[in-house]
Amino acid sequence: MSKSINLKQRPVGTPTLSDFEFNELDNDLTVSEGEVLLEAKYISVDPYLRGRMSDAKSYVPPFKVGEPISSGIVAEVLESKHEDYKKGEFVSGLLEWKEQQISNGEGLQKVDKSKAPLSAFLGIVGMTGLTAYLGLHEIGNPKKGETLVVSGAAGAVGSVVGQIGKILGLNVIGIAGTDEKIDMLKSEFGFDHGINYKTTDDMKAAIEEAAPNGVDIYFDNVGGPISDAVLFNINQFARIIICGAISVYNKTETPMAVAVQPFLVKNSALMQGFIVRNYADKFPQAMKQLSTWLGEEKLTYKETIVEGFENTPQAFLDMMDGKKKGKMIVKV
């Protein structure tokens, strides 16, 4: 019997295991014409899911209490009555946290495990890579020789942003929360500089030291005081990509930030929110470039793989707490 993981209640502040519940599904998994039966193989857990657990208005609807959570999943086709999919093929898509489920095929993409490991289609050649590539290119408009700062740099998106920056000839500075992560950024991902925000008393000064010529592009994954410190160091015509704000996702009230307008006005800087699905028409080209770079070994990636469907909620909590390297994925 297949199981699902549902949102039991809306978290107040930091989510806990009690906010999730397991449900045994007794629904019919008979495949009708135009449908496929899927079995989950890998589940992506991501910071944006925290926002969907609240009922606040956002760019995607909130999860419903008592119903399954959904995220990016790679699944195997167990049975098919859909003309586009065959038994034994693998697909990725936004699917519910269920061991098995029926799909009408909408939103599914075939994945070729001969080109990359299945888990990579949730990461570097999936939405993670697309977010990094398109955010940097479409808003960052990078030019060789410029300085790029990445917060949440040891995370799934941040680590790819930094590597793309190096491919494009940028000076790349990464911000992360442990010395081990800083070492990884420089030794494995090729970042030029790293700043441990947890052991740095004056982030403004640390950024100024690492970027004596100022910051041209800031890829913001965290928000909060770290991002405030970067603003003090931006150059004229700087571009700031707002991709996430994990530092405030668990806050019951969003804290007041430094007033950004003076920094933007005096530097003629651009600050823009980024949602990857708004650039869906550019996915094929971006995927092609990411796959090429991966094949040329210009890109590398880190994954934290958690074994077992039953451990998905804990994997989400650990991801939110920074207890991972690179992309957090559950192997079902």
Residue ranges of predicted features:
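Adenosine-nucleotide cofactor-binding segment
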Residues: 166-229, 277
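N-terminal Rossmann NAD(P)H-binding glycine-rich loop of SDR-like oxidoreductase domains
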Residues: 154, 158, 162
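NAD(P)H dinucleotide-binding glycine-rich loop of Rossmann-like/cofactor-binding domains
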Residues: 71-76, 84-152
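Hydrophobic/small residue at the entry helix of a nucleotide-binding pocket
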Residues: 128-131, 156-157, 226
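Glycine-rich beta-strand-centered segment in the early N-terminal region that forms part
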Residues: 29-45, 53-97
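Glycine-rich phosphate-binding loop and adjacent beta-alpha segment
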Residues: 225-298, 332
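C-terminal capping/lid region of NAD(P)-dependent oxidoreductase domains
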Residues: 298-305, 313-332
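NAD(P)H cofactor-binding loop motif with strongest signal on the N-terminal glycine-rich segment
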Residues: 152-153, 222
